[in-house]
């Protein structure tokens, strides 16, 4: 336990340092720059800008003259390729076309959803209001389950060609290799590698024991922060982490409490 605690503290410290050093990639996003990017695409801003919560990207609510504000999402450079972002847009637009309540990007007159301005890629979205869902109510969980079921039915109808796949290799072996290269103190490397190897071996056996595991297009980051509750309905936002994965990837982050409580929640969904 002490080993894991020390490794975790070191990792968090390193990640904070790395995050601070990478802040320069967004340093250019001044209010003037943001307004210029929006107006370059034909909208007339009224000068109001409100930064919204986002971990990887930068997201702003921008006021528009005589119209409703828009949401602008500026993508973190080098995180996704253009093809991957466009697959995100296509998937959410496909869901919207099927009358599912998701927030999909807006398309300009040329039919483009991925916009650029002075080296930054961004997309515009309609502003949608709502509150966090109350998942301690069974009826709300059942609504979530029905909507997710429809999302997954459509997700299974086609495949991603460029978005990543959730796998033990990418989320397990590759992550361990990355941490050992840079983040784990040298005196803890051997112990960490031994522990990681044991855990990954167990996971390999578990994965091998599951036959016919179906992979499909999923939201990928389905926690309550990416769900707006309005008019007794769940509205899904931010498909930035959509990927190919089992359907459970969109369910487990909605569960909380004791094992018994989580089982009940899972049954409702």
Spell out what each predicted region is.
Residues 2-109, 231-233:
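Conserved NTP-binding catalytic cores of kinases and kinase-like/nucleotidyltransferase enzymes
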Residues 39-46, 199-210:
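Short Pro/Gly-enriched beta-strand edge/turn motifs at strand-loop
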Residues 56-72, 105, 204-251:
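Active-site acidic catalytic loop and adjacent metal/ATP-binding pocket
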Residues 64-160:
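ATP-binding pocket architecture of kinase catalytic cores
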Residues 79, 132, 227, 244-246, ...:
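Conserved protein kinase catalytic core
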Residues 102, 112, 229, 254-255:
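Structured catalytic core of nucleotide-sugar glycosyltransferases
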Residues 134-191, 215:
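A cross-family kinase active-site recognition segment
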Residues 248-269:
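Active-site activation/catalytic loop segments of kinase-like enzymes and analogous catalytic loops
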């Amino acid at each position: 336990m002490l080993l894991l605690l020390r490794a975790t503290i070191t990792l968090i410290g390193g990640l904070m340092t790395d995050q601070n050093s990478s802040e320069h990639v967004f340093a250019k996003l001044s209010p003037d720059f943001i307004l210029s990017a929006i107006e370059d695409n034909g909208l007339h801003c009224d000068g109001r800008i409100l930064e919204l919560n986002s971990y990887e990207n930068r997201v702003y609510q921008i006021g528009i003259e005589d119209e409703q504000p828009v949401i602008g999402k500026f993508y973190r450079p080098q995180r996704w390729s253009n093809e991957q972002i466009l697959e995100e847009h296509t998937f959410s637009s496909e869901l919207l076309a099927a009358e599912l309540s998701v927030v999909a990007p807006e398309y300009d007159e040329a039919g483009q959803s991925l916009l650029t301005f002075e080296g930054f890629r961004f997309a515009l979205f309609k502003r949608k209001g709502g509150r966090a869902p109350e998942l301690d109510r069974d009826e709300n969980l059942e609504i979530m389950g029905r909507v997710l079921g429809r999302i997954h039915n459509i997700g299974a109808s086609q495949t991603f060609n460029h978005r990543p796949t959730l796998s033990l290799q990418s989320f397990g072996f590759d992550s361990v290799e990355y941490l050992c290269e840079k983040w784990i103190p040298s005196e803890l490397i051997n112990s960490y590698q031994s522990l990681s190897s044991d855990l990954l071996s167990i996971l390999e056996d578990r994965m091998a024991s599951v036959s016919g595991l179906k992979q499909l297009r999923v939201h990928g980051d389905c926690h309550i922060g990416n769900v707006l509750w309005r008019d007794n309905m769940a509205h899904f936002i931010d498909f930035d982490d959509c990927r190919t994965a089992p359907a459970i990837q969109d369910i487990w982050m909605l569960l909380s409490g004791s094992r018994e409580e989580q089982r009940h929640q899972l049954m409702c969904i």
